[in-house]
């Protein structure tokens, strides 16, 4: 079976030299007869080459080509929030605290939910794009859009009550009030950022990454100009920063959408809106909810850690803030590689190419380990100078210098977890990742960190030692799981996600018509030409690589399969989706009612 990887040279990565023999390559359950390193090859470091899978350098090149723009994309998203913080930081301590808390609240109660749910597309879109059924990618985009837009309503209910939630956690009343303003203004921006995330996933899982970077540049330019105009010129303060952020989110989403349409990047995977987007919400959510938990469990753990440091005093909180900012930027490097691994693994499994999927996973692990070693070395060289970038307070700088060696080891292990997270998303095993993260962070990491911080008296170092312990155990668990992973079963599940099993049933039914008793001479000619098959021979879905020839004479990419008759009727679908809409609206109305009843208290 031929496979197609958008923009990647598969043949070079998968080519084996005749008669290649030798010891098995280091890998995740790799076949010793297929994944071997030719020890007869020339070159230096023969001992090192024994650890590398065949085609490693080509695969590494493909991963870095993908992950480089994805890293820039993440940095640009991060800068969107930094710009607003910088502008409001010059207004005063209350304004700085308010915009910082506002961004954190919006991220935890809104953005993280959408980012997590949209991660289901990493599995479904990459696997569908790797299969002959590429049109199914468009159906997944439609389905994800509807589900994420519904999820906006419960998030809005939280935004409406931001002030009361913060006061429950004993935050400053003045800061809580301004944070409420920030969240309220950002309400219309949440659907924009959700759709932007989906469009980015839509392109990313086809191997298209530069439009996202370009949209991020445009969004940041608009954000900077808007912050200057609204915060510095019109003196709108925190509200101006919120307006600027909301505007930039709409600009980014609109720019990326127009780029897709005008550049016709959707032609291969989109054939219009379909009622299929109302189906299979269960399988989508079975991946989306674990994806969200896998991401949010880790995200929220660090936010809790920052909150705990605030209980110790300003010095520890400041030190935690500096380490956290460094960690956020450094994390984007393995995150980009993890995304690239997810795309490569998912696309390979969609094409039923388990060998390529394993090669991508192993190569991604080695690339991530190498980049993390480089980052760790740079941080070690900057050990005594890093704190001065953020502050001139000697006490805070000394604290940062104490914690930095722990973080250097931490980021290396975290990078391993990050790339295995990409493997889990590519194979559709997010539920396992969510369970491991929940156990390690909330049963091991945070409790151990709290004991070391408050009982033993290690303060901020205790927190990071607890985090290092949990991330190390998580990495070991992921490695053991990946080594035992059944790649053939993962490929079969990928065919289900891509809708190929339904399509095979259709093809068999339509192929049976092709084997029916031979029609009259005129009809026989039409049949053999229009269907692309000879009378008496049934077509298979792989009549041409990545292409489906329909039975009306239109060669085109494989369409999304029609639903079997045994599935829910349109009326049943509308009833169920209407019930989901009603439930989301009910949550929003409950939030609105709470806000009205508590106003003035």
Curated annotation (Swiss-Prot):
Coiled coil: none
Taxonomy, superkingdom: Eukaryota
Reaction(s) the record says it catalyses: thiamine(out) + H(+)(in) = thiamine(in) + H(+)(out); estrone 3-sulfate(in) + H(+)(out) = estrone 3-sulfate(out) + H(+)(in); creatinine(in) + H(+)(out) = creatinine(out) + H(+)(in)
Keywords for this protein: Antiport, Cell membrane, Membrane, Transmembrane, Transmembrane helix, Transport
Assigned GO CC terms: apical plasma membrane
pH dependence: Optimum pH is 6.0.
Subcellular location: Cell membrane; Apical cell membrane
This protein's record includes keyword Hydrolase: no
Cytoplasmic side: 1-62, 117-145, 204-212, 263-281, 342-361, 424-437, 481-577
InterPro entries the UniProt entry points to: MATE_euk, MATE_fam
Residue ranges that the UniProt entry lists as topological domain Extracellular: 84-95, 167-182, 234-241, 302-320, 383-402, 459, 599-601
MF (Gene Ontology): antiporter activity; organic cation transmembrane transporter activity; xenobiotic transmembrane transporter activity
Free-text function comment from the UniProt entry: Multidrug efflux pump that functions as a H(+)/organic cation antiporter. Mediates the efflux of cationic compounds, such as the model cations, tetraethylammonium (TEA) and 1-methyl-4-phenylpyridinium (MPP+), the platinum-based drug oxaliplatin or weak bases that are positively charged at physiological pH, cimetidine or the antidiabetic drug metformin. Mediates the efflux of the endogenous compounds creatinine, thiamine and estrone-3-sulfate. Plays a physiological role in the excretion of drugs, toxins and endogenous metabolites through the kidney.
Protein name stated in the entry: Multidrug and toxin extrusion protein 2
Species, as recorded: Oryctolagus cuniculus (Rabbit)
Gene name in the database record: SLC47A2
């Amino acid at each position: 079976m031929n496979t197609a990887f958008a923009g990647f040279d598969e043949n070079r990565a998968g080519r084996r030299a005749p008669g290649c023999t030798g010891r098995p390559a280091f890998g995740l359950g790799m076949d010793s007869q297929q994944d071997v390193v030719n020890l007869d090859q020339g070159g230096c470091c023969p001992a090192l080459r024994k650890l590398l899978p065949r085609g490693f350098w080509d695969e590494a090149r493909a991963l870095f080509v993908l992950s480089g723009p994805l890293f820039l994309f993440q940095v640009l998203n991060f800068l969107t929030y930094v710009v607003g913080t910088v502008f409001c930081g010059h207004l005063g301590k209350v304004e700085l605290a308010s915009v910082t808390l506002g961004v954190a609240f919006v991220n935890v109660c809104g953005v993280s939910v959408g980012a997590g749910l949209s991660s289901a597309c990493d599995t479904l879109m990459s696997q569908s794009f790797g299969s002959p059924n590429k049109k199914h990618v468009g159906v997944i985009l439609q389905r994800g859009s509807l589900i994420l837009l519904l999820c906006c309503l419960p998030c809005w209910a939280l935004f409406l009550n931001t002030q009361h939630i913060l006061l429950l956690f004993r935050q400053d009343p003045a800061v809580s009030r301004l944070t409420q303003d920030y969240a309220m203004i950002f309400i219309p921006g949440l659907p924009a950022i959700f759709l932007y995330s989906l469009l980015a996933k839509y392109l990313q899982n086809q191997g298209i990454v530069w439009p996202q970077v370009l949209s991020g540049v445009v969004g940041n330019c608009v954000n900077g100009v808007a912050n200057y105009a609204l915060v510095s010129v019109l003196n709108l303060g925190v509200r101006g920063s919120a307006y600027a952020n909301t505007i930039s989110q709409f600009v980014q989403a609109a720019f990326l959408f127009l780029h897709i349409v005008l550049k016709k990047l959707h032609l291969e995977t989109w054939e219009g809106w379909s009622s299929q987007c109302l189906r299979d919400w269960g399988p989508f959510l079975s991946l989306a909810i674990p994806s969200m938990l896998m991401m949010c469990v880790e995200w929220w753990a660090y936010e809790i850690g920052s909150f705990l440091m605030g209980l110790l005093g300003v010095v520890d909180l400041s030190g935690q803030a500096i380490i956290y900012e460094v960690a956020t930027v450094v994390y984007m490097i393995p995150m980009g590689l993890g995304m690239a691994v997810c795309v490569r693994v998912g696309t390979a499994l969609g094409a039923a190419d388990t060998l390529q999927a394993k090669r991508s996973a192993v190569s991604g692990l080695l690339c991530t380990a190498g980049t993390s070693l480089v980052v760790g070395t740079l941080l070690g060289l900057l050990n005594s100078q890093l704190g001065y970038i953020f502050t001139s307070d000697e006490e805070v700088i000394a604290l940062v210098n104490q914690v930095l060696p722990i973080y250097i080891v931490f980021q290396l292990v975290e990078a391993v977890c990050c790339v295995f997270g990409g493997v889990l998303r590519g194979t559709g095993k997010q539920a396992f990742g969510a369970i491991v993260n929940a156990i390690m962070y909330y049963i091991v990491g945070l409790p151990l960190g709290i004991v070391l911080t408050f009982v033993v008296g290690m303060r901020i170092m205790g927190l990071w030692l607890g985090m290092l312990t949990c991330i190390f155990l998580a990495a070991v668990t992921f490695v053991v799981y990946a080594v035992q992973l059944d790649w053939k079963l993962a490929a079969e599940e990928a065919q289900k996600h891509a809708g190929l099993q339904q399509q095979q049933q259709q093809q068999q039914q339509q192929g049976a018509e092709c084997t029916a008793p031979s029609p009259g001479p005129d009809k026989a000619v039409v049949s053999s030409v229009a269907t692309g098959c000879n009378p008496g021979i049934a077509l298979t879905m792989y009549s041409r690589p990545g292409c489906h020839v329909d039975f009306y004479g239109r060669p085109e990419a494989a369409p999304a399969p029609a639903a079997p008759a045994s599935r829910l009727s349109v009326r049943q679908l509308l009833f169920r989706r209407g019930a989901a809409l009603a439930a989301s609206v009910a949550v929003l109305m409950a939030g609105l009612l709470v806000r009205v009843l508590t106003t003035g208290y």
